[in-house]
């Protein structure tokens, strides 16, 4: 049997929607990263972009274990003197819940030229409404093969 070269295929990208209510942040981010990369497809190649679109709803209702709400910190620097910014996960969930999921997924993707392409296909919303109804997204929870760790 010959190996399929994904570069020569006409890749049809699916749209998936997932409700993050009550889901663990790390497990959810792992699943999303794998779908964005296309690891669930039989013709996956690490150097070819074959992934799908993912819509995440209710980003503010994710859960974390242990004391991560108070102990986990997000740090960034503005490149100005005294410009170190530090925020806890609890503050981020109250003010920027979309950013929490976006950062968790981004840090699970490979750090190469494809990372920016993968991240463009991730859509995160705090409420239960989204503006991608025209793409007819599939509910990810119905696909049990991808959802085995939850």
From Swiss-Prot:
SUPFAM superfamilies xrefs: Ribosomal protein L13
Entry keywords, A to Z: Ribonucleoprotein, Ribosomal protein
GO cellular component, one term: cytosolic large ribosomal subunit
Taxonomic superkingdom: Bacteria
InterPro entries: Ribosomal_uL13, Ribosomal_uL13_bac-type, Ribosomal_uL13_sf
GO molecular function terms noted in the UniProt entry: mRNA binding; structural constituent of ribosome
GO biological process: negative regulation of translation; translation
Pfam families in alphabetical order: Ribosomal_L13
Primary role: This protein is one of the early assembly proteins of the 50S ribosomal subunit, although it is not seen to bind rRNA by itself. It is important during the early stages of 50S assembly.
Family classification: Belongs to the universal ribosomal protein uL13 family.
Assembly: Part of the 50S ribosomal subunit.
The protein, known as: Large ribosomal subunit protein uL13
């Amino acid at each position: 049997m010959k190996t399929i070269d994904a570069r020569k295929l006409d890749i049809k990208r699916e749209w998936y929607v997932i409700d993050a209510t009550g889901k663990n942040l790390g497990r959810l981010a792992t699943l999303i990263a794998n779908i964005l990369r296309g690891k669930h497809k039989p013709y996956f190649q690490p150097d070819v972009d074959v992934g799908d679109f993912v819509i995440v709803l209710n980003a503010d209702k994710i859960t974390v274990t242990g004391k991560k709400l108070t102990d986990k910190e997000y740090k960034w620097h503005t490149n100005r003197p005294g410009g170190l910014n530090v925020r806890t996960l609890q503050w981020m969930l109250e003010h920027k819940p979309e950013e929490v999921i976006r950062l968790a997924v981004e840090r699970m993707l490979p750090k190469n030229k494809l990372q920016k392409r993968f991240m463009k296909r991730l859509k995160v919303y705090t409420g239960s409404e989204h503006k991608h109804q025209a793409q007819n997204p599939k509910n990810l929870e119905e696909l049990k093969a991808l959802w085995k760790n939850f």
